[in-house]
């Protein structure tokens, strides 16, 4: 398939200028299916996580651990036993001894027994013996701080159900869960999830290297003076940008002049590339020689596609 740097005619799609449908031409969908049927998956590579942005995941990702790994608090408050606050209210508060504090990232060093509580911060592991977390707002903590009283005791004003504000281990992801399937494109969200599993590298399909070649004596390279009868090559840049946007690595080969020798030389420079995209030179004009050269190099899988803009 190819496109021209020239403007296109605005005739109805699927026809020549005389309204005749060429039965030998493929639909865009048929052409796409033929192209995709010839592709094979490229080899994978293991790369640092941040270097994988936009690439295709080559393996299933299963969680090696539970997330969160331990039961933890969903609120800043007091970790305690529900049995100690049954019937608690502002009229009938339940008073408990505060025996410690635990912050996120630290393990509790005390066990919550009858009549006791531990101050706990959001994300901190639940101490042994505790089964419920009561937020600070449902206690007299604010009042105690305002009055300068020590936080060695607390009055609880709410009878909160067992397990309230406790996030169980594995609530987000249980160990062994299939988190991401091979074949997806790795974006920012996927990178965050993978990092949360403790992984700093993954296997991805390597990016395809795609050669881009424009053909025609009428073309000049952007950034050079424009001679009479010439136009600037724009297709190479738009195609290369599309390749990069889709996750490939574009390799612009420049402009091949309308000679078999020059075109053949340029195409020989595509070794190491996974795909070659040519622009122009595939019509029926005297100097449209891409088809001739390609037929010498291999099999022509299909020729014309019914689409606009593209076919003259």
What does each of the following model-derived ranges do?
Residues 23-89, 93:
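Intrinsically disordered, low-complexity, positively charged segments
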Residues 4, 14, 29-33, 45-54, ...:
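Flexible glycine/proline-rich
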Residues 230, 236-238, 245-312:
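Short glycine/threonine-rich loop/turn motifs
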Residues 36-43, 60, 126, 140, ...:
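Structural signal for hydrophobic packing residues in well-ordered secondary-structure cores
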Residues 35, 133, 140, 219, ...:
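Short gly/pro/ser/thr-enriched loop/turn and capping motifs at secondary-structure boundaries
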Residues 4-26, 79-252:
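Short, glycine/charged-enriched hinge/interface segments at domain edges or termini
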